[in-house]
Amino acid sequence: LWRLFKKKRKKTYPVKDVSLHELKQAIRQYMNELPDHVPLSMLINEDLTINYHELAPYLNAIPIQTYYMSKETYDIFDETQRHLAEDLDYTQRAVDQYIDLTSELPVIHGDPYLKVSYHKLMKRGLITYRPPHEFFIDPKDHLINLKKPK
């Protein structure tokens, strides 16, 4: 009877080194258990860091290192690549707005690789600076990525 009135303690998890692969596996598990109406972006903090307290039960740990996740594409980056997560979100939002405005992809006409045209995005006032890397658009889902299609 006494157990009914005892407060349940939150489980504490050790802080340890977690690889990117382990983190991705934990996120996959977390995603599979999410209700359909709850987006994965609930796992991403405002500064694009990952909410480790939500993932701790899947990792059985709290990662030492800081990982970042794009809210737009859900790509994951380590601390040295934080700028990529920020630039991906920035550019993906602009690409989505461009498609909404023009019903076209913001690429140079005839480009077989579908490289994002920063010029077209700037011309429409959708971006104010050009990210230092090239992004490519997937023709199926219109998500951008860093991989040049073959």
Task: State what each model feature region is.
Residues 1-150:
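Short acidic linear motifs
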